[in-house]
């Protein structure tokens, strides 16, 4: 019932149980239904926390993307590589060094932009890859945005990814998915620089 009145929904696989998974799908489907009515645009964000270390989480993520059609798919480099079906090295909730996007390695930025762009085209969702460099790809164009703001200290703070998911959902309630992702990443990254 609550999801039916919400303008946006954020879903995280970070602390998932069977009961939470059921609620996640009920809410995701409610948002999808509401988006297809005269009541205005409604959208969801899925945060792929830990899909590289749990087949249960991976299957939930794939199912949510298929059945609920989120506007935004968010994850670190390992998680996005995994959901895109490309080789990945992550085994936990943190990105592996081999999958990380780094300003010091321009090829990692280009490679991840390509992977995110392909996933965006396949799913119809904006794909947000988080890390030292945030990559945002839209299904509506062939451009991926790379955001180089932030601080190395942000990686030492547990929960910054969850914060970004919530900020993205907040912006998503008032604007399109691409703008919401860019604004959310800039908001958190610039705050991290202070």
Specify the residue positions occupied by each region the protein language model found.
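Short beta-strands and strand-loop turn motifs
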Residues: 10-12, 43-48, 96-99
